[in-house]
Amino acid sequence: MKCEGFSQITDLADYLDNNRLIAHYCAIVVPYRVRIVIPASEMWEEGEERPDYVLQNMVGATVDLIIIKVEREGNFAIGSRRLANRSQRYFFAHREDLRSIGARVKCRMLAVGPRRCLVDCYGHDLDITQREMRYASIPDLRNEYHPGMEIDCIVKMFDPDNDKLEISIKETEVNPFFGAEQRHPVGSRRLAVISGKYGGGVFCNLPDGVVCMCNYSYQHEDADFMVGEHVMLIVQRYENEKLQMYGKIMNKW
C-alpha cells in the first residue's frame, strides 16, 4: 500500500490502549478510501528505529502492513508495518530461490537522500549507498530515484541465523569498466561530465557509464570546475585490480 503522507499527531495505538497522549509521527495510508495510520512505533523493529525525517521522506513509498486495530467511531484503522515485515522475512528465509547468493529479487525504495537510500527487500530495511546503486557516479540520488520505485537487485549474502541480508543493485548490470581499455585506450581524449569531487580527486562519467578518476592539468584548479560541467579529459592509466580508470582534466567543453 502506498504511503500518502505523515502527520505529527498523537500515538494512536498508545492512546487507545492507555488513554495517554504522546506526540509522535505517524504514516498515513489510504487504500479503498479508508484511512490507516501507522504509528512510528509500528514502522520499525525494536532497535532499528529511524529518525523522524526518514519517515517524512517516505511519502509515496509502498509498504506492507497488518491491521491491528479498528476505530469505527473515528473512521480509521491502525496498521503495523513491523509485523508485516516479520511475515515477509519469514517467507524470504524459507524460499531457496529467493535467498540463495546471486538470486535476482525485487526491492522497493522507501526514502531517498543525496548519497544513500533506504530500501525494503522482503521485510529487510537496508541502507544502500550511492556506490551500490550504480557503477556510474551519481551527484544526487534524488534526481534518479524516488520512494515507491521497485527495482531489481542481487542477493550478495543472507545469514538466516541472524536474519541479515546484503544486496547489490548495480550488479544487476554489466560493469562498464570491462572492455573500457579497448574503447578508451591510454592517451585518448574523451568528453565527460563531472559527477563529484572527493579527497582531491574528481569523478567524471563517460557516456558509456565508465567512471574516470581525474586530477587537473597544471593550469587549472578546483574552483575552475563545478559538478555537472562537461570537460575534456585524457586517459592516463588503468588499475584492473581496483577496476578503475584514471585521467587528467584538460579543459571545459
Predicted segments — roles?
Residues M1-W253:
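Single-stranded RNA-binding regions, centering on S1/OB-family and related RNA-binding modules
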